[in-house]
């Protein structure tokens, strides 16, 4: 049996953060164990250039404690510091946490391997305590 981790994760976060991946999005792992960091950097830059909402897995570890900050610096070359972001930690476990913040704030945030990070696109908004990326770019689709 094959189970999709992305679908499971997206379903878990939907109720936690709102609708962070409502339009085109990409999922990028920051782990360089099997993928060279240079390729991860290119993928981050391309996702930012394309105005994708982004989901980041494996954002940090003991050996890669600064990779999220490196990723944020790459994204800030094309995305506004006010871009809405969200983090979830320990989804479905004791101590579950969520937080909505800006890309500038995310740059200064420490996370671990139990954290999933979401970076919105140019249309993503904070609505109450939810992160919402509308399905279309026209304002009447929000």
Predicted regions located by residue number:
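Anionic-ligand binding region
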Residues: 19, 23-48, 63-71
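General beta-strand structural signal in soluble alpha/beta enzymes
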Residues: 4, 21-23, 87-88
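Short, surface-exposed amphipathic charged segments that create phosphate/polyanion-binding patches used
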Residues: 16-19, 41-44, 98-104
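A contiguous loop/helix-start segment that scaffolds small-molecule binding in enzyme catalytic cores
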Residues: 49-142
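Short secondary-structure boundary/capping segments
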Residues: 3, 44-45, 108-109
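Hydrophobic packing residues within well-ordered alpha-helices of enzyme cores
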Residues: 13-14, 71
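Single conserved hydrophobic/aromatic residue that forms the stacking wall/gate
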Residues: 1-12
């Amino acid at each position: 049996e094959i189970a999709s981790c992305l679908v499971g994760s997206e379903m878990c976060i939907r109720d936690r953060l709102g609708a962070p991946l409502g339009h085109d999005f990409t999922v990028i792992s920051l782990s360089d164990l099997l993928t060279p960091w240079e390729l991860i950097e290119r993928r981050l830059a391309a996702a930012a250039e394309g105005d994708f909402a982004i989901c980041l897995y494996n954002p940090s570890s003991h050996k890669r404690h600064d990779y999220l900050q490196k990723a944020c610096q790459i994204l800030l070359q094309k995305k506004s510091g006010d871009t809405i972001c969200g983090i979830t930690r320990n989804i479905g476990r004791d101590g579950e946490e969520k937080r909505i913040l800006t890309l500038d704030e995310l740059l200064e945030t420490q996370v671990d391997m139990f954290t999933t990070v979401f970076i919105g696109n140019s249309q993503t908004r904070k609505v109450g305590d939810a992160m919402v990326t509308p399905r279309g770019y026209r304002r009447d689709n929000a």
